[in-house]
Regions:
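A structural signal for short, well-ordered beta-strand segments and their strand-loop junctions
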Residues: 1, 36-38, 98
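Residue-level detector of solvent-exposed, low-hydrophobicity positions
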Residues: 10, 47, 78, 107-109, ...
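Conserved beta-sheet core of the metallophosphoesterase superfamily
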Residues: 13-91
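A short C-terminal boundary segment appended to hydrolase-like catalytic domains
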Residues: 89-120
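Cofactor-binding loop segments of dinucleotide-utilizing enzymes, especially the Rossmann-like FAD-
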Residues: 3, 70, 102
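Short acidic, glycine-rich surface-loop motifs adjacent to enzyme active sites
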Residues: 1-9
């Protein structure tokens, strides 16, 4: 788990990801990490490494990146911030990340992404 994100939301470009993220991601995935959690930008984003990085052979192990939205109230005068949580589930076949956002009275499922585990 990282405070800063490895994966940024596509509409937020002023909050840069953690420094040297390509090297860090390679080391985390190389050490066997299958799920890397981050935050800091108050917006949810979920992706699997192989969707944006060409990896082959032993390096082709799945590695899901999940950036959590803020759990607290969005900051004043900040557009595009969500109040929400991520729920992670895993079994022998897949890692699933559910994004739940606050809808005024309760949290509701906004998105769900599932990624196959292991090598292709």
């Amino acid at each position: 788990m990282l405070h800063h994100q490895l994966l940024g939301a596509p509409w937020r470009n002023t909050k840069l990801p953690v420094a040297r993220r390509t090297r860090l991601l390679g080391r985390l995935a190389g050490a066997g990490a299958e799920l890397v959690l981050g935050g800091h930008i108050h917006q949810a984003a979920v992706a699997e490494r192989r969707a944006f990085e060409v990896v082959a052979g032993a390096r082709a192990q799945a590695c899901v990146l999940a950036t959590a939205p803020g759990l607290g109230r969005p900051r004043p005068a900040r557009a595009y911030e969500a109040r929400g949580v991520l729920v992670h589930r895993a079994d022998e076949r897949a890692i699933t990340v559910d994004v739940h956002v606050w809808r005024g009275e309760a949290f509701a499922l906004a998105a769900s992404s599932s990624f196959p585990r292991g090598s292709p």
